[in-house]
Amino acid sequence: MNKEEIIKEFQIHEGDTGSAEVQVALLTARIKHLTEHLKKHPKDYHSRRGLMKLVGRRRKILKYLRNKNPEAYKEVIQKLGLRK
């Protein structure tokens, strides 16, 4: 999935590129990509640190979304398959 497809799927209204839902979806795509990279290159510690920063940023945005709009939080979690 490329960036435009992710934005179209999660945007709230036309032209929405910065809502919490879109940000979480884009971060999730980057996290998945970096995770695959680290499976091939396990000693790439620089990328591993970047991955940890992305995960932390996604966690903060999800916490914000959970507090502000629980319904949207549940929908995003379900669509992305993040929580069990």
From Swiss-Prot:
Example GO biological process: translation
Entries under SUPFAM superfamilies matching the protein: S15/NS1 RNA-binding domain
Superkingdom of the source species: Bacteria
A Gene Ontology term for the protein's cellular component: cytosolic small ribosomal subunit
Keywords: Ribonucleoprotein, Ribosomal protein, RNA-binding, rRNA-binding
UniProt cross-references to SMART domains, sorted A to Z: Ribosomal_S15 (SM01387)
TM ranges: none
Pfam families associated with the record: Ribosomal_S15
GO molecular function, one term: rRNA binding
PANTHER family linked to this entry: RIBOSOMAL PROTEIN S15, BACTERIAL AND ORGANELLAR (PTHR23321), SMALL RIBOSOMAL SUBUNIT PROTEIN US15M (PTHR23321:SF26)
Role noted for this protein: One of the primary rRNA binding proteins, it binds directly to 16S rRNA where it helps nucleate assembly of the platform of the 30S subunit by binding and bridging several RNA helices of the 16S rRNA.
Record-stated family: Belongs to the universal ribosomal protein uS15 family.
Complex formation: Part of the 30S ribosomal subunit. Forms a bridge to the 50S subunit in the 70S ribosome, contacting the 23S rRNA.
Protein name as annotated: Small ribosomal subunit protein uS15
Taxonomic lineage of the native organism: Bacteria, Thermotogati, Thermotogota, Thermotogae, Thermotogales
